[in-house]
Design a protein with these regions (language model features):
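Short, intrinsically disordered, charge-balanced linker/junction segments flanking boundaries
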Residues: 140-146
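Charge-rich, well-structured scaffold segments of protease-associated domains
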Residues: 1-140
Length: 146
């Protein structure tokens, strides 16, 4: 199983796999960050656009967007997580790449493994795979409140 979710402060990737496949999972997922492939993202964009359209029919989502827009004016929290309709219709690959390079850095990452995994072995594999990521200076987001 593989899934992802986006919040205001995080992007989460969820996976379920047998412990015997840990090395394969680490290979695949470290490559996602070490050598990302930015190609046409139309298929995923369609999924996000469907989510956006569904959110426009959900009272709670509309209320939350309205509340955050007025509580945090000018802050990224004031914008809907899914973005604006016009941005979804005309996405810019360059903007996606810039965002990725700014925020998807080792200093902003956390890896959590749960299950029947041997810690010492897992740590060696993790350091071997993810240790190839180049350290970056993490950006500081805007303060929520002053």
């Amino acid at each position: 199983m593989l899934n992802a979710a986006t919040g205001y402060d995080e992007t989460m990737y969820y996976s379920s796999f047998p412990p015997s496949q840990l090395y394969k999972w680490l290979d695949l997922n470290s490559e996602r960050f070490i050598n990302p492939v930015f190609r046409a993202f139309q298929p995923e964009l369609e999924t996000v656009y469907e989510e956006f359209n569904r959110s426009q029919d959900m009272q709670g989502s509309l209320q939350s967007d309205f509340m955050l827009k007025h509580i945090f004016p000018g802050h990224p929290y004031s914008r809907a997580i899914l973005g604006l309709q016009e941005h979804l219709k005309k996405p810019r690959l360059g903007g996606l790449v810039d965002f990725y390079k700014s925020w998807y850095v080792p200093e902003n990452m956390v890896l959590i493994l749960v299950g029947n995994i041997k810690l010492k072995e897992a740590m060696g594999l993790i350091n071997d795979r993810f240790g190839r990521l180049n350290p970056q200076k993490a950006l500081n987001g805007k303060p929520i409140l002053k």
